Design a protein with these regions (language model features):
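Solvent-exposed, acidic/polar segments of extracytosolic/periplasmic ligand-binding ectodomains
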Residues: 13-18, 35, 345-401
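Extracellular/periplasmic periplasmic-binding protein-like sensory domains
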Residues: 243-316, 327-332, 383-400
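Extracytoplasmic "Venus flytrap"
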Residues: 22-57, 81-88, 110, 175-182, ...
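Beta-alpha junction/loop-to-helix N-cap segments that form part of ligand/metal-binding clefts
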Residues: 23-25, 49-56, 69-138, 205-212, ...
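Extracytoplasmic ligand/sensor domains, especially the bilobed periplasmic-binding protein
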Residues: 103-203, 253-277
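Signal peptide-proximal N-terminal region
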Residues: 30-32, 37, 56-78, 194-196
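N-terminal export signals
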Residues: 1-20
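Immediate post-signal peptide segment of exported/extracytoplasmic ligand-binding proteins
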Residues: 16-39, 70-75, 163-169
Length: 401
């Protein structure tokens, strides 16, 4: 992995590239041969477990784009920065990428907390972020393309499925103590109660905390039909191990999580989380031709033991969606790329075709997967059609921070 601030160059300049003056009128880092973009994730700290795959996926996409001739005939160069699992650091590094490196776009962030810190920088510097993580919704910015699912595509869809298919009536909500889990659980609670079901407990642990004994004890005492867990980063390892140590077996106790993908399972260990359900657009096990090619390319670049989760897949989408928007706009200028983005379709996405909505989120399918001991998921449900994104669903708008 590259160190912060370094740039990686991959040859692939196509002939006949349009003149730089015609495709760059705003002073971003574009020459006749290259254009620079930023990658901004946590390579260190508690979030490195979750964000490492995003870095790898973005680098793979950029390499593939360069090998196919680049963007508007220019190869993509990367300026990488480490957010270090610290939200103000994310803001500072985003400012550097935009003000000093003058990148045309940033691919990055993972937590809602880091995204919220970066948003004012994007607005001040007129930047564009491709954000890969499923999140709570309740936000829409012209400076962000959200490649992950929002609440209606994940939280509500997952709850509706477990109520319908498992007959769930009572829920215990648990999460890491920051914006995304708290906002997501507020949405979940309202939806659960609107459906005539009950929340029998709600608890949080600090991000990075490894002491879950008291929370696990309260879960056992409450005896919920469903544990609804949004524990994030390295805390996942401790949480699931302590559930098992307390005798909570996920082949008997229903657990639905929005925060565990194949990436996190690699750190947790399949024996501790097998049986859990998660709602996502992507699973590595999807039997689609585009996904088989994606998995093969990812493993060829990063090793045969590499795994790919939903957010890693969403990160891979970012550079491709940016390329399509740049080529539609005929320009690297951020305002033109933003204007060109709605309606962009990515027919070759590993999870299946998707497109950008006017609200900067994605039309996409939703799937339910059940964790296996080998670190993969069995897909037990998927929607037939693409689900329209709605970051401000009826009855939830007032929850927006």
């Amino acid at each position: 992995m590259m160190t912060a601030g370094t740039a990686r160059r991959v040859q692939g300049l196509a002939p006949g590239a349009p003149a730089t003056a015609a495709v760059n009128r705003s002073g971003i880092a574009v020459t006749d041969e290259a254009v620079k973009v930023g990658i901004l994730h946590s390579a260190t700290g508690t979030m490195a477990l979750s964000e490492g795959g995003s870095i790898q996926a973005e680098m793979l996409a950029i390499q593939q784009i360069n090998e196919a001739g680049g963007v508007l005939g220019r190869r993509i160069e990367i300026a990488q920065e480490d957010g270090a699992s610290d939200w103000p650091t994310f803001a500072a590094r985003a400012d550097k990428l935009l003000a000093q490196d003058k990148v045309a776009a940033i691919f990055g962030c993972w937590t809602s907390a880091s995204r919220k810190e970066v948003l004012p920088v994007l607005e001040r510097r007129d930047g564009l972020l491709y954000y890969p993580t499923f999140y709570e919704g309740l936000e829409q910015s012209r400076h962000v393309i959200y490649t992950g699912q929002e609440a209606t595509q994940q939280i509500l869809a997952g709850l509706d499925w477990v109520m319908r298919e498992k007959g769930a009536k009572s829920f215990f909500l648990v999460g890491s103590d920051y914006i995304w889990p708290r906002a997501s659980n507020a949405i979940a609670r309202r939806h659960i109660e609107a459906k005539g079901c009950r929340v029998v407990g709600e608890d949080y642990a600090e991000l990075g905390d490894t002491r879950f004994e008291s929370i696990v004890a309260r879960i056992k005492a409450a005896k919920p039909d469903v544990i609804y867990a949004i524990v994030v980063g390295g805390s996942n390892v401790a949480f699931y191990k302590q559930l098992k140590a307390a005798g909570i077996e996920l082949d008997r106790q229903i657990l639905m999580t929005n925060s565990v993908t194949e990436d996190e399972m690699m750190g947790i260990g399949g024996d501790y989380i097998a049986g859990a359900f998660t709602c996502a657009k992507y699973f590595q096990s999807l039997e689609l031709p585009a996904n088989r090619a994606f998995v093969a390319a990812f493993k060829a670049m990063w090793g045969a033991d590499s795994v790919i989760g939903d957010v890693t897949h969403n990160a891979y989408l970012g550079p491709w969606l940016w390329k399509l928007a740049v080529e539609k706009a005929g320009s690297f200028d951020v305002a033109r790329v933003i204007a060109a983005s709605p309606g962009i379709e990515f027919a070759g996405a590993p999870a299946g075709p998707l497109r950008i909505h006017e609200n900067h989120h994605l039309w996409t399918r939703t799937r339910i997967g059940r964790a296996r001991r080998d670190g993969q998921f069995d897909v037990v449900f998927e929607t037939r059609d693409l689900i329209e994104p709605n970051p401000f669903p009826d009855g939830f708008r007032e929850l927006a921070a």
